[in-house]
Amino acid sequence: MVIGASGKTGRRCVSYAASKGLPVVACTRSGAFSARDAGVADASAAALVASERCDVSKASAAELATLLDGAGSCIFAASASPSGGSPWEVDKAGLVAVARACLVAKVPRLVIVSSGSVSKPLSSIYAFLNLFGGIMRAKIEGEDAVRALYFDREGCDYVVVRPGGLTEDEPRGVAAIELNQGDDKSGRIARADVAAICVEAAERAGTPVAADATFECYWADTGKSLGEVGLSNALGGTTDEKAYASGRERRGNTWDELFEGLDADAPGVSQQGWGPSL
C-alpha cells in the first residue's frame, strides 16, 4: 500500500511495485489514481493497481486501520502541499496516525519517506527547507514519534528513508546508490531511485533486512558532507577524492547487498538534533 500515491515519489512507488508484479493499492486524497498516468504502461502490471481514498490529515483512526487491514507493508510517501494539508497535519500528525493504524492492523512494515539533514537543525539545508511551514521539524518529530510507538513491538517494524536532493532524472539503479547512517552526508538522487528503495525495503517486510533502520540515500557520485552538499547540489557537483567519508556508507550491486549491515535505531530514542530552527 502506498499512501500519498498522487505525489511525485508516491506514484513512482506504485509504478515500480507494479512493474515487479506486486499487487499495490494507491491511496490518494480523492481516491482516484491512473496507473497509466503513473507510468504503468503494461496492461498486466496496471491490473495489479487498485486505488483507495485516504486523506491522512482527516481520516479517523478506525478508517485508517480498516484501510490497512491485510496490507503486507505500507509506504508513507505523503507530504504537505497547498491542497493537502500543512506539514504538521501531514508529515507529523498524518504519519503518526498511519503508524498507529499499522500497529493496530499488524502491518509488518511501515516505510517512511522523510528527508536528508532532517535531524540537523544547524545545517543550511534544514534551515532553508524549514522555512516552508516548519516542514523539517514536522518530519523529525513525526519520525521520532514513530520510533517511540514501535518501541518493543514484535511483528511490526519501520524503515525511515531520508533522500538527498530529489531530481526528475531517469533512475540509475541500485549500483549507483549509496546509503549512509548518521545524517551527516547527502547528495542528489532521482525520485525513481528513491521509489525503488522504498518498494525493495517494503518487499522485505517480515525479515531482519533494514528493520527499524534509518538511513540517507543519494547517488554515490554526488555524496558530500552536509556543509558542502547544498551548494554542490545546486551546481550539479560530483564527488572527488577529497570528499567527506563518514565510514558508514553502504554500496551494493544488488538490493540485499545495499541493505546489508544497516544498523537498527536505538529503540525508542529521539534523533532530533538541537538548533535555532527548533
Write out the residue ranges for each language-model feature:
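N-terminal Rossmann NAD(P)H-binding glycine-rich loop of SDR-like oxidoreductase domains
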Residues: M1-L22
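Active-site-lining helix/loop region of Rossmann-like oxidoreductase modules
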Residues: I3-A5, G164-L278
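NAD(P)H-binding glycine-rich loop region in Rossmannoid oxidoreductase-like domains
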Residues: A26, G31-A105
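Glycine-/Pro-rich loop/turn segments that contact NAD(P) or position catalytic residues
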Residues: A80-S186
